[in-house]
């Protein structure tokens, strides 16, 4: 089984496990079970790894906004660490977070913020993708291609994807108290000539974090 197929199979298994724990109006934290899985990350709410989740205190006067921060200790892509004979390689990380609105509340907004930094010499090309999801629905993505002919000293993507209340893009129709799974996917893919030893790197910014906000509202 290929690495991509294995990751997909494990994602499905984790999602089934998370979904089985989520129930309408259940008495538990609004943002709770989570996992991070891929060639560049591996951790779970009850299994330590190279990602951890931190709660962010609620803002005064904003009772229905919930925030968490995921911190990545060593999620990075380095060309020099890959066998020169490999022409295409990359790193991926899929983060999944269960959101469980309390009784009488529904999800009305989702937001994700992160920063990706890349640098490279002439030679390799880089494809960088950051995507926010709710269940199987894509809420938005930021996609960049750094061409092989370009020398890039510093490229920074300030990713801020938002859907629902206060945003241009809507959320899918959700039921009162309906639990969902928020997803965020990183995909960094490099392509180079065989046996080409050229500098290239992709990393998260200094904070090495992903912040996810969820906004709830009274059901109407």
Predicted features by range, described:
Residues 106-119:
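A short beta-strand element within beta-rich, extracytoplasmic domains
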Residues 9-17:
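Bacterial N-terminal signal peptides
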Residues 69, 155-198:
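Cysteine-clustered segments with highest specificity for TGF-beta superfamily mature ligands
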Residues 1-9:
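Bacterial N-terminal signal peptides that target proteins for export
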Residues 87-102:
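Short beta-strands within extracellular/lumenal beta-sheet-rich domains
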Residues 190-220:
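Proprotein-processing/basic-patch segments
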Residues 116-173:
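Short helix-loop boundary/capping segments
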Residues 26-83:
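N-terminal leader/pro-regions and domain N-caps
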């Amino acid at each position: 089984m290929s690495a991509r197929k294995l990751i997909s199979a494990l994602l499905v298994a984790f999602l089934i496990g998370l979904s089985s724990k989520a129930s309408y109006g259940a008495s538990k934290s609004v943002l709770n079970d989570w996992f991070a899985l891929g060639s560049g990350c591996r951790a779970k709410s009850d299994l330590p790894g190279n990602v951890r989740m931190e709660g962010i205190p609620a803002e005064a006067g904003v009772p229905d906004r919930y925030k968490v921060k995921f911190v990545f200790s060593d999620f990075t892509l380095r060309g020099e660490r890959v066998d020169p004979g490999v022409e295409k390689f990359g790193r991926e990380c899929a983060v999944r977070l269960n959101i469980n609105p309390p009784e009488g509340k529904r999800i009305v907004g989702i937001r994700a913020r992160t920063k990706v930094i890349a640098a490279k010499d002439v030679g390799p090309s880089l494809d960088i993708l950051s995507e926010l999801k709710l269940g199987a629905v894509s809420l938005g993505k930021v996609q960049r291609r750094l061409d092989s002919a370009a020398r890039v000293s510093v490229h920074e993507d300030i990713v801020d994807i938002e859907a629902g209340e206060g945003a241009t893009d809507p959320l899918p129709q959700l039921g009162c108290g309906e639990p969902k799974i928020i997803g965020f996917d990183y995909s960094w893919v490099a392509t180079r000539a065989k046996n080409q030893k050229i500098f290239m790197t992709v990393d998260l910014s200094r904070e090495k974090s992903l912040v996810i906000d969820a906004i709830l509202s009274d059901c109407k």
